[in-house]
């Protein structure tokens, strides 16, 4: 569905949840699947791991189970690998790169069909972001809020695995450039051993058929 937002050294796959997974689960993954309480979660897990294994195949690495950290719920990648998995109701996606080439990867999918209470902006956005949103027409403001929310999800998913620092929504300030379909973010706090307060970086976003994808890498 989505073209890759990454350079060639990062492998990206996206899948429609209404179709069977391309890559079957490995035994340990299948065992974990049976612990999930709903068919929805099982479908998302199966397709997310399928996308991850397809992405890993580019690097010709021996297949390993990609399980989930019981405490942080992040995927447990092979030692030489950095990656991110996301799903949102209708689609799943994964992005993978080798640790020699990339320090961290973060992706997030959001369905724009889902109605979101705009009041959550007070919990997600810093003052600068709120000012920008409040100057937009209501439909554009809701769209902008979703991009900011998704971008911050991608930022956390990129930085947490390599820093073990919990970032909260207001620890990052996001600026959106609609013309280039990019966003820039500035961190207000340090991520241990990885970034300092004031760190500034950019990512990309794409919207296709009411589905939003945000992506960053370091």
Please give the residue ranges for each predicted region.
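Core catalytic alpha/beta fold that binds nucleotide/phospho-ligands
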Residues: 1-218
